[in-house]
Every structure is written in structure tokens, then in C-alpha cells.
Amino acid sequence: MRFSTLLKDLQTGEAELRWSQCGADPILAGAASLEQAKGDQLSFLEKGNALIAALTETGAGALLLPDQPDLIQCASERGIAFAVLANPRLAFAEALERLHPRLRPLAEIHPSAVVDERAVVGPGTFIAPRVCIGASSRIGANCIVHPGVVIYDDVEVGEGCELHANAVLHPGSRLGRGCVVNSNAVIGSEGFGFVPTPRGWRKMPQTGQVVLEDGVEVGCGSTIDRPSVGETRIGAGSKIDNLVQIGHGVTTGRGCALASQVGIAGGAKLGHGVILAGQVGVANRAVVGDGAIASSKSGIHGEVAPGEVVSGYPAIPNRLWLRCSAAFSKLPEMAKTLRELKRDISQ
């Protein structure tokens, strides 16, 4: 694809193409990082990116750049075709879709798949080998169900969903339109509910369901548990990384982002647009307000106000945590000073 042709496609996207200099108008066969790109590949750079130095050595045939004069000058002097955009990263994502279009499998049900006669599979849907679909389940139109997926009874999957190899959807699970469940993720597994008795732990039946609203994506090996009653609900457009555990009865708002190894205990509530970085833990029934952000390994107990950024365990406002961290490194010196003061006083 010619760079100029790609830019015409990007003009209709959301990345706000401002102007371009196509030069020799290279033919692009793909895309790569700035350090690894070759003459037939596209790359990009964001404003203030630490890789700016790599621009002087990149072998990329074309670049997507922010409106930053030094970057534009460098690309011009090196004779690299480029385009200036308000959001180069978004433009790069759109470009990848055009440079590497996905091949959609034919709509068919493989002979080795086991589909209950009471299940319904919508038109245009592909069911791969060794898929199991239980009674009264409904798979919407234009879905892709990869090998080894297990869909229990009474599951609903909306239009345009993709279920990757060995994903499992337990009874009563509900997926909206355009959801993606990656390999080995488990939706609707039993919540961790037990009642202590003199004879040991009594199991609490988990009769609820999990609901993924439209556009939710769940990473590999992540689990979302169903509650004893009611539902666990993930808000529309939320993105869940690999190896995330979401407990029974949790609710999240729209557009949340949960990084790898996040753990959310039962009954916790997340508002819209919440971001939890890697290994964040959220305690039982904690409440996180709209737009709040928790940095890696934060432990959230109680309530986080809307828009607040928290860090540490237990989680505290990020600015306070930074001050505490700075003081922590000085503790040995402070302890030494304190011992000297005590010795001087005792004399």
C-alpha cells in the first residue's frame, strides 16, 4: 500500500491528520517499532517520547509524527515520508488495521463441534473444531468461536463477538455485542462463597450470572466469577488484561482498564473510566469513583474519590505516597541521627 493511499484512509479516522510530506511515496508492506522498522515499514513517534533519539537512526520508510518542530525537521532532513497528526498512536492503530487486515473464517459449524439441538447459532457465525455449546444457549450473528471453546447451557453471546481457544462461558453468562474473550479466560465461574460451620466450610450455591456489556475485552487466563444471587457486571467498553481476577458481585462502570494481576474482591464497585495498574488489589465492597487511577501494587480499602490518583498499600493519595517514599529511603540516616541525639542527651 502506498503511503499516500494509507493517509487517505486515515483522513476518515479519529486521529486528526493535519498535513503530510510523502516524498517518494513509499510502498508499505507493514509496520514496526522505530528501532526495528525497515524501508517498507511504517512507524510512529509521540510527543515527548523517550525514543526521539532513535529518529536519527530509524530505517522506517514512513512515519506518523506529532506536531513537534524538531521531529518534523529531522524527518525532513533525512528524507523520510511523514504525516503530522494530533494523535500519532491512534493513527498507528488505524494504520495497522489497514496494513494487516484480518482474514475472517467462513461461516460454518465444524463437524467435530458439539452443538446442542436446543442451542441457536446466528447467521455468519464460525464454529471451530471441538467447540461445545450447551442447551438453550444463543450465539449471535457474525461471531467467531475458536477451537476448544466451551459454552455451557443458557449462555447468550451477542453479535460480532470473538471467543478464543479454550475460553469457557459458564451457565447464565451474558455477553453484549462485540465482546472479545481471549484464550483460557473463564466467564461466570463459581464465586468464592463459603459459610463457616462447626463442621467446616459450607458451600454457598452461586446462582447468579456474569454480564459483559458491549465491547468488553477479557485477556488470557482472566476469571470473572458469578455471585450467589444477582450479577457481576462489567461496563461497556472496559478492557481487562491477562491474569485478572474479578470476584463475585463486582460491578464496573463503562470504559475501565484493568492491567495484569489485578484482583477485585466480591462486591467492590468501580465507576466509569477507572484505571487499575498491574497487581492492584481492591478489597471486599470497596468503592472506586469515576476516573480514579491506582498505580501498580496499590491496595484499595474503603473508598477512592472520583478522579483521585492513589498509590501504595494501603492506598493513599499519590502525592502523599511520593513524599512518604522519599522519606523511606532516608530512614536509616534518620535512625542514626536519632540514636546520636539520644546518646548526646543521655550524656
Swiss-Prot record:
> Might you give the EC number(s) for this enzyme?
2.3.1.191
Q: Which domain of life is it from?
A: Bacteria
| Keyword terms | Acyltransferase, Lipid A biosynthesis, Lipid biosynthesis, Lipid metabolism, Repeat, Transferase
Record's catalysed reaction(s): a UDP-3-O-[(3R)-3-hydroxyacyl]-alpha-D-glucosamine + a (3R)-hydroxyacyl-[ACP] = a UDP-2-N,3-O-bis[(3R)-3-hydroxyacyl]-alpha-D-glucosamine + holo-[ACP] + H(+)
Where does it sit, as one GO cellular component term? carboxysome
What's a single GO BP term from this record?
A: lipid A biosynthetic process
The UniProt entry's sequence similarity note says:
Belongs to the transferase hexapeptide repeat family. LpxD subfamily.
Quaternary structure and interacting proteins, as annotated: Homotrimer.
Q: Which HAMAP family match?
A: LpxD
The protein's job, in short, is:
Catalyzes the N-acylation of UDP-3-O-acylglucosamine using 3-hydroxyacyl-ACP as the acyl donor. Is involved in the biosynthesis of lipid A, a phosphorylated glycolipid that anchors the lipopolysaccharide to the outer membrane of the cell.
- Descriptive protein name: UDP-3-O-acylglucosamine N-acyltransferase
Q: To which species is this protein native? A: Synechococcus sp. (strain CC9902)
